[in-house]
Amino acid sequence: MPTIAQLIRRERGIAQRKTKSPALKACPQRRGVCTRVYTTTPKKPNSALRKVARVRLTSGFEVTAYIPGVGHNLQEHSVVMIRGGRVKDLPGVRYHIIRGTLDTAGVKNRMQSRSKYGTKRPKPGQAAAPAGKKR
C-alpha cells in the first residue's frame, strides 16, 4: 500500500485492457488472403475434423480462422473477410471467416439462421427443395 507522499510523486497507472482479437486492430472486420486451407482436430473430449484457414490480413497479421457451416469453396489465394470470435475447442483459433462475402460462398440449402451463413432467402416455390432422397 503506497503512502500519500508516494501517490503524490507518482499517481496510479490505469490498467490497459488486452484485446481478444489483436489482428483486427479495433476494426469490426478485416480482409485477407488464404495462405492455407486445412482441417484440424479439436481438444479433448471432442472429436471432429474442423475446417480452418490460415489467412494473411491487410493489417499485416497472419491468423488462423474457422470456416463455419457445412461445406465450403475456399482454397489457397481466396480473398476472405474475417470477424472476431474464437472456437472454444480449437486452440489458437480466435477468428471466424464470414460466409457469403468476397470469395466465400454461402451455405447451400440452409433454411434457419441464414444471415449467419450468407444464404439468400429461397424462392417461395423452392421451400421444400432437395433435402435428400424421398422414398
From Swiss-Prot:
Modified residues (3-methylthioaspartic acid): D89
Entry-linked PROSITE patterns: RIBOSOMAL_S12
Listed GO MF terms: rRNA binding; structural constituent of ribosome; tRNA binding
Gene Ontology CC, one term: small ribosomal subunit
Pfam families reported in the protein's UniProt record: Ribosom_S12_S23
Annotated keywords: Methylation, Ribonucleoprotein, Ribosomal protein, RNA-binding, rRNA-binding, tRNA-binding
InterPro entries: NA-bd_OB-fold, Ribosomal_uS12, Ribosomal_uS12_bac
UniProt superkingdom: Bacteria
Compositional bias annotation for Low complexity: 124-135
Region of interest (Disordered), ranges: 103-135
Example GO BP: translation
Bias kind Basic residues: ranges: 111-123
Assembly: Part of the 30S ribosomal subunit. Contacts proteins S8 and S17. May interact with IF1 in the 30S initiation complex.
Function: With S4 and S5 plays an important role in translational accuracy. Interacts with and stabilizes bases of the 16S rRNA that are involved in tRNA selection in the A site and with the mRNA backbone. Located at the interface of the 30S and 50S subunits, it traverses the body of the 30S subunit contacting proteins on the other side and probably holding the rRNA structure together. The combined cluster of proteins S8, S12 and S17 appears to hold together the shoulder and platform of the 30S subunit.
Family according to the record: Belongs to the universal ribosomal protein uS12 family.
NCBIfam families xref list: rpsL_bact
Name of the protein: Small ribosomal subunit protein uS12
Gene from which the chain derives: rpsL
